[in-house]
């Protein structure tokens, strides 16, 4: 009996050992299999791609949040005005549209010149020149307020001319007049944001934007609910909120010393190179404004059909704005990364940033488009309970998913174009795409075929499809070596050939003529691309010794006084002309 028991125990122990061996072998096999999978995944995604994805996401995520904060300022104002009445709500909605078209879009577009100038200069490590570019932007954007004011002061005549209700037009003019002093603050907030984001600093905009929105909600509540100031209270709340955003961000920059590396005090150099700044600023403005204006006009045209079409268009436009913020984050990140790399002379990293940003943005946009498609029948209930509007929005959303994908591609590639400094081609593409293809097609389908806003969005789809195709071809055909040369010139640095025939970067205030005669000519760069890649990783190794803050021909003091004085005089005359025109038109139209 004991022998049988002993045998059984021995047999059990043997079975246990065998099971343990099998478990070990199984675990070992699993680990080998998982390890092999990880190795295969690593081989599919090179290390430099993973690093680039991480860097892009670090920028794109906060950009999305900061843009959402900006959007919420006007959105909250509209929501608070909802209880005032239809006439008041219509007046505020039209006023905000006019402010966006003739004000905010102008400042935001002009500030986009910094997407090229600051990103490339920061990448070159010529840091003090970044501060001078900021000063230049401050002066130019403040002057840009004058023609914007000349348009804004004529809001009522413009609305009366397009047959809006006199009461609505009058309320819109009241709102705009109260908001007008906030325009410089809105412009400065845009410029400060560009100054930081092109250095890879994003979170301050998120933090100050959140604080500004909290203050905006409180002020709207006090002015509209407690004090019952109506439309004037809403405008005053918006004005205070714009100043709070600009002041909060300025204080944060000073508090955290984010300006120390790039700011060397006000310099007379900021009066130089206005032509170079404007040559980038105007196409940048057109790239943004052409698109922005088209959608705003689309809303007005929808109102000519019926209130249902107008309501549906308003909902679709709000949804499109929110959805676009996802690819916008990647567009900004691509612009920053490409500009930084070109300024550092790192051509290959610039191309890598462009590829990774486009792929990541498209993947995220596919997810967003899928979500919109799955919720198309209910998503409009966020904004309204009117069944006719909900049904109309649902019909547009069927097509909008495809529109969003190509809109994302166009937006991200547009960011790459800005980072490379090719805004002129981008502006021409947008003008042709929207005003010669998309908008005429949409309006024809909208009215001639009685398709309403569905026809309008079909026209917009054709536009973004052509846009995305053009930008992809442009980036594919882009001479990246030449783009690197141009970035180095803008950044105030140039290539110098050393004794061992390698290339280095030297900070110089070279003129374009001198640059053409130097080693940075296209012929001199036939074999330089490999050398360029090893020069700098984000600007390291580029000495600031002898750095110049001015590039190109330097104007004398007398020339500066005359030219900048004439610029100021011209802006003041434009504003004066707007005031005189307003007095004449109001009397005539009334």
UniProtKB/Swiss-Prot annotation:
Its main location: membrane. Belongs to the multi antimicrobial extrusion (MATE) (TC 2.A.66.1) family. GO terms for cellular component: apical plasma membrane; membrane. Residues 1-59, 110-137, 189-199, 255-274, 335-351, 417-430, 474-565 are cytoplasmic. Residues 81-88, 159-167, 223-231, 295-313, 373-395, 452, 587-590 are extracellular. The keyword Magnesium does not apply. It is a multi-pass membrane protein. It comes from Danio rerio. Keywords: Cell membrane, Membrane, Transmembrane, Transmembrane helix, Transport. The chain crosses the membrane at residues 60-80, 89-109, 138-158, 168-188, 200-222, 232-254, 275-294, 314-334, 352-372, 396-416, 431-451, 453-473, 566-586. Pfam families: MatE (PF01554). This is Multidrug and toxin extrusion protein 1. One of its GO terms (molecular function) is transmembrane transporter activity. It is found in: Cell membrane. GO terms for biological process: organic cation transport; xenobiotic detoxification by transmembrane export across the plasma membrane. Solute transporter for tetraethylammonium (TEA), cimetidine, metformin, guanidine, N-methylnicotinamide (NMN) and also the zwitterionic cephalosporin cephalexin. Responsible for the secretion of cationic drugs across the brush border membranes.
